[in-house]
Regions:
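Binding-site signature for planar aromatic cofactors or substrates
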Residues: 3, 9-218
Length: 218
């Protein structure tokens, strides 16, 4: 099973790690997996000759024999479709987030901050290249994101689907390390946290998501 970790490292040590103070560390791997599955549109980072490449992709997050598997596909012309095999790709899951106003704090000697949840997943990639396996990948993706579309997809002409699949490169990443962080005002007083939750709950978008996660902390 991939390990879940957080590191408070000195500068120059473990530079590939996400900075995570202990009170913000997610130590439960299943909690991290559930977050990744809920917020599955992520950012994949690879490095080639010291230069990072980045693509934003929807992922299928699954577990197989106690291993976390991340599955997605690139446009075939995307250079990352080949770069992913070199080194250790990083996939970043980073929603929701919210601005936190100091008006919610008891002391006037306070400054704004940002609450968020983020999971960084590292692993080893393999390509999914055969038409049969790519078809399976696409059906799995449709099943997760819009199951009602499966019937229409199945009815599409075979040559049309084959041409579509020629334009993509599927891949899966077997995760060997997870770094997970939830910065949800754990370092504030209970009254301040409740005031932040009330403030965020009255807003829209990702603020409500952070409020819900904060309310779930006990």
């Amino acid at each position: 099973m991939g390990r879940t970790s957080g590191v408070e490292a000195d500068a120059g040590k473990h530079i590939n790690y996400m900075y995570t103070p202990k009170q913000f560390l997610i130590t439960d791997q299943q909690e991290a997996v559930s977050f990744m599955q809920r917020y599955s549109f992520a950012t994949i980072v690879t490095v080639n000759d010291g230069v990072p490449s980045v693509t934003h992709l929807p992922f299928i997050v699954s577990q197989r024999d106690d291993k976390i598997i991340l599955t997605s596909h690139f446009a075939k012309v995307n250079p990352q479709a080949t770069e992913i095999l070199s080194g250790k790709p990083l996939v970043i899951f980073a929603e929701p987030h919210a601005y936190i106003s100091p008006k919610n704090y008891e002391s006037v000697n306070s400054v704004p901050t940002w609450n968020y949840i983020a999971v960084h997943a590292y692993g080893t990639a393999t390509l999914i290249e055969s038409p049969e396996k790519k078809a399976g990948l696409l059906e799995q993706t449709i099943q997760f994101y819009e199951a009602d579309y499966l019937k229409q997809w199945s009815a599409l002409p075979a040559d049309f689907k084959l041409n579509m699949m020629k334009g993509i490169t599927g891949f899966e990443i077997m995760v060997d390390e997870i770094q997970a962080k939830k910065k949800l005002s754990q370092n504030r007083t209970e009254q301040e946290r409740q005031d932040v939750i009330a403030d965020l709950s009255a807003k829209f978008g990702t603020e409500k998501g952070i409020a819900a996660y904060m309310a779930g902390l006990r």
